[in-house]
Amino acid sequence: MRPVSPLQLLLVLSLAPQPVLGSPKQYFLKYILEPPPCRSEPGACNMFCTQQEECPEPLQCCSAYCGIVCTSNQAPVLGLS
């Protein structure tokens, strides 16, 4: 029996199926269905939402540390020093 060359071994290992976490379908559904992250921390986490239509006019539905809430979602103002 001939010894196996390192190149043959590398070829076999590269062709072996690699484990994959989740599926692309789950990733895209999560991206489409979940609102974007909030740009600033919400003042109060008492107005929850699942869609933009559930929030009053000036507020936006976004994902924060306390859940998916309606907030002003304004970008934080950086002070110049």
Curated annotation (Swiss-Prot):
It is found in: Secreted. It comes from the Eukaryota. GO terms for molecular function: serine-type endopeptidase inhibitor activity. Residues 1-22 form the signal peptide. Disulfide bonds join 38-62, 45-66, 49-61, 55-70. Keywords: Disulfide bond, Protease inhibitor, Secreted, Serine protease inhibitor, Signal. The keyword Ligase does not apply. One of its GO terms (cellular component) is extracellular region. Residues 31-74 form the WAP domain. The keyword Disulfide bond applies. Putative acid-stable proteinase inhibitor. This is WAP four-disulfide core domain protein 13. It comes from Mus musculus (Mouse).
